[in-house]
Amino acid sequence: KILKLCNEHKIPVVPFGTGTSLEGNVVGNEKGITICLEKMNKILSVNVEDFDCRVQACVTKEQLNDYLREDGVFFPIDPGANAAIGGMASTSASGTMAVKYGTMKTVISGLTVVLPNGDIINTGSRTKKTSAGYNLTNLFIGSEGTLGIITEIQLRLSPIPESIMAAVCHFPTLENAVQTAQQVIQYGIPIARIEMLN
C-alpha cells in the first residue's frame, strides 16, 4: 500500500536494509521517504540437498552463513561488508570470490518484488536451468530499487570447501599481477578468491 500511495503522489522512495553501501545507494531524498526493511530478516527455507534457500531481504550474509554452517553449505558472495542479501541483490554485488562462485546474478534464481504500483510479483524459480519466458529476475538484480523493492530472494548455495589455503604474492608491476592471475585461471588451478591490493 505504501508504494502504491507514493507512486500515486509522485513521492520518491528509498529502500533501506543494513546501510553498508559505500556508494551512497541509501542516501534519501528530502522530498521522499525511506522504507526500512530491517524487520524482514528471516530465513524462510533451506533445501540442503538441492543447494538452495529462500530469505527475506534484510537477512545478512553472515547471519545466513552462520545458519547454514552445520549443513555443510554456504552462501559464497562476499562483498566485504556484512550486507543484507536484498541490498546485495539490488546492487548486483560480487566480491573477492567472484572468480570461482560468480556474482549475485549467478546465485539468485528467483525474487519476490513489490512494484511501484503496489503489485507483488515472483520471478524465476528453484529450477537450476530454464529457458521459459523472460528473465525478469536479472532485470531486478542491480536495479537499486528503481524498478521495485526486493523483499525475498531465492539463492543457490555451494558446498563448504574441505580446506582453504591463502597466499600473498608481490609483483613488480600491475601488468605482471594481472597476467599471473590470468595464467592461474587458464591453467585450471583451483582458486576461490582473488584480490589486488596496491
List PLM regions with ranges:
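Short proline/glycine- and acidic-rich turn/helix-capping motifs at secondary-structure junctions
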Residues: L22, M196-N198
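FAD-binding subdomain of flavoenzyme oxidoreductases
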Residues: K42-E49, C53-E195
